Amino acid sequence: MVLCSNDTVRQLVHSTPIVAQSFIEEDGSVTLSMSDLDLVVNAENMQEAKQALIDDLTEYAEEYYQNFELYSRAPNRREHLSLVMKVLTSASKKELEDAVQCQNGKI
């Protein structure tokens, strides 16, 4: 077991990207998708979409942490740990929203 402070964990996961595919829908709304996490949100604009994505990502991170024994061993979730730790140790929701990197999605 390794014990370290939130600041140390934050430094370790600082470079972990939060990457989402972005799609502008026909009605002008914005869809953001993190397919590796099965997260998809839609909102009226990019800012609201980022906020919704971070809300869903935070919920997932908390669920991962609560079920750590299971999730950390699951082949489809094991690789999410650094992102989960980034979310859980972030200083603010705004910090996470600013960290979201949107790439043009392709259908």
Regions found by a protein language model. Name each.
Residues 34-47:
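A short, exposed loop/beta-hairpin motif centered on an aromatic-Gly-Thr core
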Residues 16-36:
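Short aromatic-glycine-(Arg/Gly/Cys) micro-motifs in beta-strand/loop hairpins
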Residues 1-19, 23, 51-107:
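Short, charged, surface-exposed hinge/linker loops at domain edges
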